[in-house]
């Protein structure tokens, strides 16, 4: 936050005392260049800002600045800031720089600006001037200065990479642009300081949310054509043991886990049902992107990937579980270590059995460790966990794995003796559980709009009545948000992350979305007649005529709402979900599914689906 902005009639300059050259933005064509001829005698129009990037909408190109931030945390001497306020300014000579947004008359452009503001205000955007937050500690240590710029950043978690794509391309020609690129993450950093025996321990959990297929719960499921999984997160647990003598002797241990949606073509289609229709494409359609997804994971994390599947063995999740299991066993590049645990059947009481099953893989894979400036161990096995949403069940399992690793780390470095266990220290264990529960809540809020379910298991290690009641309320909130509000939020993701680019769009969506008053007639009739009938039954003795007078329109309105329920879902307007534009529910697709069922019946005498 030490950058200044100076506005001139034909250009805009960003300067910083710590940078060799100023960044010049041409107000005619929006081109970026480096300049050493800035007149610093001119008072800055804006000071103490941080460049977020540049985004072009339908008419104008804009510079996005962080104008206010808070100190969020400090890790290994590096300050981490959270962006609190943003400012969006048009890059053009036809509008005043500071008040340009007030002079924009185009309704569609204003709607895009509103969506961009919504995108910037969602979640937590974190950055550090001295630490690349896109990389885990292990990745940072293995990088060398000989790598090019594009190899330094971990683009999987570079949240504002679309806003910086122009500068990144220019860096390939002139490395001077590199110092103006500030990678930011959408994520959370939770830190707690604890005292264990005679040791001062600092526990930190860093969450990195991937921008590659980001969005809301029902509009981003499965995997996209590029092999990027929905709701993909990297969670790094760092434990720092302070030396009483010198900082150089500090021990730092970290363990990284990942989670993401099942990398297959599948969806749950919003239709106002509490559990929407689950649609799964044939496995052959998903095999290519499945392999691409895990190949990219192998490139980032190595070939030793452990896949933990928490889907139900029976019920509506069974076809998805079976298909995922088959693809895992088919995949040979890289080969996957597959572990299955039916959480809803086994529950949290059998977690020790699950940990015993993967114990050898965790011990073999180790963790990253450094003592002072020397690296003493490297993590070689990485666990990828998923359930249906990669939220509630996944939180419980990843917390259990993290606790197992923490126990192992503290034993290895001598903080705990071989006969001791972390479970014996209630105060430290409570801090550990709280920090992981908050991490789960953050990821869940990004994806669903509510804290995670089963948070009481993460916090207390067992189910509680109060926790079950909170889950009930959060389920209701999820239903409302996911059905009636997530469409616009998904639009904000697609616009801010470059999935939809207004200047390059051939079809202009109907923005902003307006509902004709006739759409509210049926819900109004249903609600009004239901209230009247309820009042009459509770406080009066209505005649048959009165009952029929209100019951008939109520039933008709209810039937209309049932058969037109998808029209009342808040759908995205910029980019339709894959299943909505890919013919998943076309007559041809239904005919194919019916044909497959008939074929199964003729072959095995059963309509039961075998995935």
From Swiss-Prot:
Q: Which InterPro entries match?
A: SAC_dom (IPR002013)
GO terms for cellular component: endoplasmic reticulum; endoplasmic reticulum membrane; Golgi apparatus; Golgi membrane; serine palmitoyltransferase complex
Q: Which GO terms describe its molecular function?
A: phosphatidylinositol-4-phosphate phosphatase activity
Q: List the GO biological process terms.
A: phosphatidylinositol dephosphorylation; sphingosine biosynthetic process
Superkingdom to which the source organism belongs? Eukaryota
Q: Where is the SAC domain?
A: 51-351
Please give the family membership noted in the entry: To yeast RSD1 and S.pombe SpBC19F5.03.
Q: What is this protein called?
A: Uncharacterized protein C3C7.01c
